């Protein structure tokens, strides 16, 4: 069971051939505050997984053996970037990020019946391409940055704005498949 509304996470599981269902957790991400980004994403992932796991019906959901919660943020120059609040914030962030590096952090929480909860954060370094103001404005005008942690989608138009990665590709999309393989 994927405890996420993210279409990108669903696509990752589908492409990897991992059968799953989706239930949105309903967790208000703004209610969970933490100064340290690694702990923040772990707490959010845990809250999402626990919210869905607690709502499982023992009789109707008996075939569900695991619940996976995830949450991602970009750690950039000491700040935590979730989804931009609007186009102005997205442009301001991209003006700072262009030509620099940031760490995309994804918290993962796997809850299985009668097994210990598994909680982890996977980090991937993202090298952003140097972009002109016109390139930044065109990308933000596409609307894509407003839907993604950090304000970019590696698997979409945002891939054109990235020079490279150090770490897990799928983690930047929202779920580390190598991590998931090791815990399943």
From Swiss-Prot:
Keywords: Cytoplasm, Hydrolase, Nucleotide metabolism
Keyword Transferase part of the UniProt annotation: no
Signal sequence annotation: none
Keyword Hydrolase: yes
Subcellular location: Cytoplasm
One GO term of the biological process aspect: nucleotide metabolic process
Reactions this protein catalyses: a ribonucleoside 5'-triphosphate + H2O = a ribonucleoside 5'-phosphate + diphosphate + H(+); a 2'-deoxyribonucleoside 5'-triphosphate + H2O = a 2'-deoxyribonucleoside 5'-phosphate + diphosphate + H(+)
Active site residues according to the UniProt entry: 71
Cofactor(s) named in the record: a divalent metal cation
EC class of the enzyme, as a word: hydrolase
EC number per UniProt: 3.6.1.9
Pfam families: Maf
GO MF annotation terms: nucleoside triphosphate diphosphatase activity
CDD domains, sorted: Maf (cd00555)
One Gene Ontology term, aspect cellular component: cytoplasm
HAMAP family in the cross-refs: Maf
Family: Belongs to the Maf family.
Function: Nucleoside triphosphate pyrophosphatase. May have a dual role in cell division arrest and in preventing the incorporation of modified nucleotides into cellular nucleic acids.
Protein name: Nucleoside triphosphate pyrophosphatase
Source organism: Synechococcus sp. (strain CC9605)
């Amino acid at each position: 069971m994927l405890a996420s509304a993210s279409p990108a996470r669903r696509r990752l599981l589908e492409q990897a051939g991992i059968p799953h269902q989706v239930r949105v957790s309903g967790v208000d991400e703004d209610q969970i505050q933490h100064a340290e980004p690694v702990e923040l994403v772990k707490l959010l992932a845990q809250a999402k997984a626990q919210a869905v796991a607690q709502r499982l019906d023992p009789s109707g959901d008996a075939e569900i053996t695991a619940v996976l919660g995830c949450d991602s943020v970009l750690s950039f120059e000491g700040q935590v970037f979730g989804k931009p609040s609007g186009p102005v914030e997205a442009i301001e962030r991209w003006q700072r990020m262009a030509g620099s590096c940031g760490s995309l952090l994804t918290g993962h929480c796997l809850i299985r019946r009668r097994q210990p909860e598994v909680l982890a954060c996977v980090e991937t370094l993202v090298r952003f391409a140097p972009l002109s103001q016109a390139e930044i404005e065109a990308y933000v005008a596409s609307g894509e940055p407003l839907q993604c942690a950090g304000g970019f989608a590696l698997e979409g138009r945002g891939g054109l704005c990235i020079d490279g990665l150090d770490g897990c590709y799928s983690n930047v999309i929202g779920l580390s498949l190598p991590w998931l393989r090791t815990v399943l």
